[in-house]
Amino acid sequence: MTEATKEDVTAAQLLTAPVGHDGARKGMDVDILDVEELRDWQRRKRSEFEEALKRNRLDVRQWLRYAAFEYEQRDMRRARSVFERALAVAPGDVVVWLRYVDCELRARDVNHARNLLVRATALLPRVDKLWYKYVLMEESLGQVELVRGVYTKWCTLEPAAAAWDAFVDFETRQGQVEHVREVYSRYVMVHPVAATWLKWVAFERKHGDAGTVRRVYSLACDTLTAFAGADVHEVEQLVVSFAEWEATQQELERSRAVLSVAVSRWPESSTLKDATAQLEKKFGGARAGESILFKRKREYEEQLLAHPLDYDAWWLYLDLLEESFPAELRAALAEATVKAVPRSQEKDMQWRKYVNLWLRYLLFLETVLVDSDLTRSMYQKLVREVIPNTKFTFAKAWIMYAEFEIRQEKLDKARKILGMSLGMCPKPKLFQYYIDLEIKLKEFDRVRRLHEKLLEFQPDVLSNWIEYAELEENLGDEDRARGIYEIGLTADGGLSQARQLQLMQRYIQFETDASEFERARALYSRYVALSGYDPNVWISCALYESSVPTAAQVASYAHDQPNSDGDDSDDAYEQEFELTEENKEQTRAIFEKALRHYTSEKDDEGRILVLQAYKDYESIHGSAEARQKIASRQPRKVTRKRTVDGIEKEYVAYEFPDDTVSTSSVASKFVSLAQRWKQQQAP
């Protein structure tokens, strides 16, 4: 075989050669050989950019691409011109300003960049990005005084705390301690909160001495307490920090004095009292700490003896015992469940707090004592004897009881507990927990029964119907899902008309997601009737036809993809669907049907809404002839007169060109019939 024979190419090879070549076709490289070709190529590119901007001059990204092109051609004059034109279109676009500045900096034209930042910050003084860009540029150039001036000008606008922090960091890097103090003196006036003062304190701790730190703390306390409406939490945070710092300086008397003055001013503050106790516990010796704890314990006991229904005091008392007297905690918990029984017969905040005391007791029995039998018996007492289930209940108690049994690996008991709760005192929260539990266990038959019970309990709640239908949809049983939707839409379903309309919307979405477009179209017809022929529903129905494939398109896809997997059909429709003339004609047919309905019902308002929607649709998808035709059918306002109670009044009415055309056609038909009859009667 010769070399020529080896290189012969057959027709079969030519046909099969493209197969297997994946990937997009690479763009063609343009070889520019001389300056004239370069100028011609640049002229074509500029024409392309200009044409694109003529079509949409508000496309900021196109402006930026245009400017980047000019910069790449080393034509800064044209690049600046493009940027300036872009700013004329979108002067408030921060990205354009930043790209413009970056372009000038890359071109090493610092003065132009500086002038741009001056313009930008003057036009958009509240945009922090521009200020940060300004100071970063000047600092990178070593212009310390200019940076300080920019920060000073920026801070006159009272920006957010981050800007002040950046100013402080800059002065700290320069080693200008006094300048930092001046910045902080203005910073705390603009943002007079504890966090700002504590930043100043942290600075003085590092760069100052004990005297400067103490002066800042004192000034902070005086400033915050001078305001009548000062936030107590802010003051507490500052005072506690002041006292802790004094203690670290071994100034215990000063620390006690700070806390004492604060407690005398805010005697109800538990934070200040706790800080005082912690100080004494840490620096006052073991005896002092114990005396404080015993004193607090005695005060709580006296308070609870006088007011046994003070549940907040019970909670604080139990916290104290848990932390410092753990041996007494069990007895106190049991005592709380006995002495603190609410007197009211209604579910109020007292009952909620009392049940929370019970639940704390039960968690103690389970986790600390690890006595499952006692815990179980106390749970039974709570849900059967303590809580008046005939009047109200607490779903949290039942759920925690069931979770306890699950932790004990007693799933059957947990189910019985939840079933008992639904039988004695059904609540949506209990149903939802039980349903979620069975879903996790994949017991879907039980889930179905629970959903049915929930619908019997609350048939008027829309979410119950939707969640049940979505369960069947997720399980792949579309027929059961349809049955649930259909029952919900019946009069026996229990839903109001407004909720039936919402359920119908979800039903249509379900059929659409399942690619059952014909079913969805039939549902839309029912939806229109159910809504009382609402114009918005008519419009939605019409536009739906332009968003889904027609029957012919579905059949064509099924023919082209006979072995396609059903699970991917929705994605395939979304990828392959294209709006065709058939879609448009179906949409127009529904618009026309709606117009005929409102014309026969003499509903001008509905007719106007449909005509306007029809016009909007044609403006997007219609031809020039279609747009002109629908525009000619729009109603005109006319002023007419009528007599009411003997008084002539003017009112605004609408004239529809369609009515005039139909009247003229009827009249012409009548005349033609009369002429024909006359001819027939002639001898």
UniProtKB/Swiss-Prot annotation:
Disulfide bonds: none annotated. GO terms for biological process: cis assembly of pre-catalytic spliceosome; DNA replication initiation; mRNA splicing, via spliceosome; spliceosomal complex assembly. The keyword Zinc does not apply. SMART domains: HAT. SUPFAM superfamilies: TPR-like. Keywords: mRNA processing, mRNA splicing, Nucleus, Repeat, Spliceosome. GO terms for molecular function: chromatin binding; DNA replication origin binding. One of its GO terms (cellular component) is U2-type catalytic step 1 spliceosome. It is found in: Nucleus. PANTHER family: CROOKED NECK-LIKE PROTEIN 1, PRE-MRNA SPLICING FACTOR. Involved in pre-mRNA splicing and cell cycle progression. Required for the spliceosome assembly and initiation of the DNA replication. Belongs to the crooked-neck family. Associated with the spliceosome. This is Pre-mRNA-splicing factor CLF1. It comes from Eremothecium gossypii (strain ATCC 10895 / CBS 109.51 / FGSC 9923 / NRRL Y-1056) (Yeast).
